[in-house]
Amino acid sequence: MSKKPVRVAVTGAAGQIGYALLFRIASGEMLGKDQPVILQLLEIPDEKAQKALKGVMMELDDCAFPLLAGMEAHGDPMTAFKDADYALLVGSRPRGPGMERAELLAVNGAIFTAQGKALNAVASRNVKVLVVGNPANTNAYIAMKSAPDLPRKNFTAMLRLDHNRAASQIAAKTGKAVADIEKLVVWGNHSPTMYADYRFATIKGESVAKMINDQEWNANTFLPTVGKRGAAIIEARGLSSAASAANAAIDHMRDWALGTNGKWVTMGIPSDGQYGIPKDTMFGFPVTCENGEYKLVEGLEIDAFSQERINKTLEELQGEQAGVAHLI
């Protein structure tokens, strides 16, 4: 029995990340090789962006994906999010030269307030929302607060890029396969303050912390490398990390939808107060996923160094939340 198509809304669909993302969704990499999809693609309602979106759709057509059951172009979230089962909010306003962070928060605040309200009005009541557009945690917080009729747990922010970056650095340091790394955690904000924590991580049952056994490397090389990786890629490539961000979005949604088989992954989720993180703060936590639901990994010990790092990233997030409080 073939499955009924699900509706996947993607914003910023003609952008760099959108271009790296859509073909992989349509090929079945995100929701499985037996799940047809209808793509509901949103771009800003100006002629140039809509024309570019049409070009992307022409290419999607030309791939003749068996799982692509339909697609639509939209300039309004109220139509783009209609009955959406999944929503990937990729589009956001990047920080321009000389733009203050407060200004960036305000501009994106308006975008994500409107998108949260639209999801609240027209999306499926079980819609799974992933915010990719930066500042991702705060944009997800705004969207969640703007959608009071949808469950809080349906809103998530993307920390998977930080998680994957951290795994890659650990694999390089230990000379082991990245696929064998388990129980890695990234706490906090998707920003250079995030705290990638390998204290619980294992490779084929062996402790990563014992293998590396170098706190100076952890504090002075590993954490800054992971935290500033996005800036390093812009410096090298002249463009932001679009393909790796799209890959992380696929990983995040696939694991949420199809499960992690008991493995830990990192998701930005609204806190319920665990680990001392105030309720509703959109924070990177370790989770496992099963039957379309994520579950927080609880009871992990937080040592003094980790607490200091968690406090630092929390402080930044609370500052961002305060900066958008007037919008909510």
From Swiss-Prot:
One of its GO terms (biological process) is tricarboxylic acid cycle. InterPro entries: L-lactate/malate_DH, Lactate/malate_DH_C, Lactate/malate_DH_N, Lactate_DH/Glyco_Ohase_4_C, Malate_DH_type2, NAD(P)-bd_dom_sf. Belongs to the LDH/MDH superfamily. MDH type 2 family. Pfam families: Ldh_1_C, Ldh_1_N. This is Malate dehydrogenase. NAD(+) binds at G12, A13, A14, G15, Q16, I17, G18, N108, Q115, V132, G133, N134. Its EC number is 1.1.1.37. NCBIfam families: MalateDH-SF1, PRK05442.1. Catalyzes the reversible oxidation of malate to oxaloacetate. Substrate binds at R95, R101, N134, R165. The active site is at H190 (proton acceptor). CDD domains: MDH_chloroplast-like. It is an enzyme of class 1 (oxidoreductase). It catalyses: (S)-malate + NAD(+) = oxaloacetate + NADH + H(+). Keywords: NAD, Oxidoreductase, Tricarboxylic acid cycle. One of its GO terms (molecular function) is L-malate dehydrogenase (NAD+) activity. It comes from Variovorax paradoxus (strain S110). HAMAP family: Malate_dehydrog_2. SUPFAM superfamilies: LDH C-terminal domain-like, NAD(P)-binding Rossmann-fold domains.
